[in-house]
Amino acid sequence: MGLRYSKEVRDRHGDKDIEGRVPMTLNLPQGLYGRFNCKSCWFVNKGLIACGDHYLCLGCLTRMLSRTDFCEICSKPLPKKIIFEDSPSAPPYEP
């Protein structure tokens, strides 16, 4: 399977590559597919929950906990307590 253009683009530009188009490679940054995505549904979110050596979103964690106490991906016990490691972004209240 190669890259295919629509008939309109081929008629206008021929079979040559269009200038300014950047080819997609498999060397994507880890942020697009890596550890900060839910390994069950690949949802990207800052509110992911650590499970073993990967992360799960709250929806997938809830679904897995309704079926079993162990992770379906890494077979380790699922987290039952959420620990927030980031400090609040708002400044402290000073009256």
From Swiss-Prot:
It comes from the Viruses. Its main location: virion. The keyword Zinc applies. A zinc finger (RING-type) spans 38-74. Myristoylation is required for the role of RING finger protein Z in assembly and budding. One of its GO terms (molecular function) is RNA binding. Disulfide bonds: none annotated. It is a lipid-anchor. Interacts with protein NP; this interaction probably directs the encapsidated genome to budding sites. Interacts (via RING domain) with polymerase L; this interaction inhibits viral transcription and replication, Z partially blocks the product exit tunnel for the releasing nascent RNA product. Interacts with the glycoprotein complex; this interaction plays a role in virion budding. Interacts with host eIF4E; this interaction results in eIF4E reduced affinity for its substrate, the 5'-m7 G cap structure. This is RING finger protein Z. It comes from Allpahuayo mammarenavirus (isolate Rat/Peru/CLHP-2472/1997) (ALLV).
